[in-house]
């Protein structure tokens, strides 16, 4: 199953605010559907609620179904709180960290920066958006990168958003170091990750 490339506002109207998908807000208050009234009087089943939480995670991080299931399996395999571990795995992706640091306005743009070879880890170019960063990794913009101006502009526009404490960012060098794994409070996406784990419990 391929990654979603359709209208982003339609998804955010249906699922709520998804900071990784888009920062734009729709003028339409109702969920998508005929006259915006398809959900009136309807109550989601337990399965429907779990599915919706899964969809939030999938669309926010720009994942395919196969990718998300793989992250869930890896989170189950590790010791600790499975839901938090799942979020930590997603937040330690290189594209997610670039977005969190303000290098890009969305995860899709962050993914492009990585794909085009503009991001380095420990001074080496890494062009894989799903690359799992580790503690003490140093993330920076490639020297003489054509995207440096774009990144600088995005950082200025993103100054409202605080850099989480598990990252340390040098705005002069455009360089960050991963100090720790994120806490639940560091994840801006509003969802119940336990329901996502439950959704995949029979697989």
From Swiss-Prot:
Coiled coil: none annotated. GO terms for molecular function: rRNA binding; structural constituent of ribosome. Residues 17-39 are annotated as: Disordered. Residues 92-164 form the S4 RNA-binding domain. Keywords: Chloroplast, Plastid, Ribonucleoprotein, Ribosomal protein, RNA-binding, rRNA-binding. SMART domains: Ribosomal_S4, S4. InterPro entries: Ribosomal_uS4, Ribosomal_uS4_bac-type, Ribosomal_uS4_CS, Ribosomal_uS4_N, S4_RNA-bd, S4_RNA-bd_sf. It is found in: Plastid, Chloroplast. GO terms for cellular component: chloroplast; small ribosomal subunit. One of its GO terms (biological process) is ribosomal small subunit biogenesis. Its main location: plastid. CDD domains: S4. Belongs to the universal ribosomal protein uS4 family. Part of the 30S ribosomal subunit. Contacts protein S5. The interaction surface between S4 and S5 is involved in control of translational fidelity. One of the primary rRNA binding proteins, it binds directly to 16S rRNA where it nucleates assembly of the body of the 30S subunit. With S5 and S12 plays an important role in translational accuracy. This is Small ribosomal subunit protein uS4c. It comes from Phaeodactylum tricornutum (strain CCAP 1055/1). The lineage of its organism: Eukaryota, Sar, Stramenopiles, Ochrophyta, Bacillariophyta.
């Amino acid at each position: 199953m391929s990654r979603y490339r359709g209208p982003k506002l339609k998804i955010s109207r249906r699922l709520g605010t998804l900071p990784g998908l888009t920062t734009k807000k729709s003028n339409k208050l109702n969920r998508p559907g005929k006259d915006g009234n398809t959900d009136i009087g309807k109550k989601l089943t337990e399965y429907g609620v779990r599915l919706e939480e899964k969809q939030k995670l999938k669309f926010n991080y720009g994942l395919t179904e196969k990718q998300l299931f793989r992250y869930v399996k890896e989170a189950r395999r590790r010791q600790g709180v499975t839901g938090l571990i799942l979020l930590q795995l997603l937040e330690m992706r290189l594209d997610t960290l670039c977005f969190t640091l303000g290098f890009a306005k969305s995860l899709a743009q962050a993914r492009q920066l990585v794909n085009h070879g503009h991001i380095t880890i420990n001074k080496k170019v890494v062009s894989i958006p799903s690359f799992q960063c580790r503690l003490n990794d140093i993330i920076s913009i490639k020297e003489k990168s054509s995207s440096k101006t774009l990144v600088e502009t995005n950082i200025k526009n993103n100054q409202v958003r605080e850099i989480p404490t598990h990252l340390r960012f040098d705005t002069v060098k455009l360089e960050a170091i991963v100090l720790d794994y994120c806490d639940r409070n560091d994840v801006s996406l509003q969802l119940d990750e336990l329901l996502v784990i439950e959704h995949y419990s029979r697989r």
